[in-house]
Amino acid sequence: MLQYLNKNGKIHLLSENNINITEDNISSYPIIFICNNQYLQLSSNQINYIAKHIKRGGFFIIDNITSDYTYSLFIQQLMPEFEKEAIQIENIFNNMIFDLAFEENPFESNGIFINEKIALLGIKDFSLLDAWNNENEEFLRLGVNIIFYYLTR
């Protein structure tokens, strides 16, 4: 994904895998992407750090949510003062660097908006990471648009 972003979006980002989120280092990660149900393994301190980070402008993406119930509990713990809203990706992430051409919404997603900007994006029963690893062009374009959205809003 990052190579595609660099080559086609002319945006250069670094990534780290398996970070240990602490109060001291979280600001080093403006975009935090967590896969599957790994959000369930976060400590209460890490959840508090992420909540503060999101409120300060960080972007938190949860990929491939498999349980509405546990996800709802997590969101309530993370950001109790905000309501999650349904997100139609083609309405928000289209016409940035790339025009997206999905025949229909490829997955269900929701998020939390702060100051009219998506601060948390939850993707249900679909893995963007897998689509990127499989070099699916449409989802690589979507990934570039998501990052561009974050950087320009």
Give each language-model segment a name.
Residues 9-21, 62-65, 86-92:
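Surface-exposed patches in mature extracellular/periplasmic domains of secreted proteins
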Residues 67-149:
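An acidic, glycine-rich "communication" segment
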Residues 16-21, 43-49, 103-109:
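Alpha-helical scaffolding within the catalytic cores
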Residues 28, 55-56, 114-116:
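Short, well-ordered loop/turn elements at secondary-structure boundaries
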Residues 31-71:
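Short alpha-beta junction capping motif
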Residues 7, 55-56, 81:
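Residues at alpha-helix termini
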Residues 1-31, 35-38, 119-120, 127-128, ...:
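Aromatic-Pro/Gly-enriched surface loop or interdomain linker
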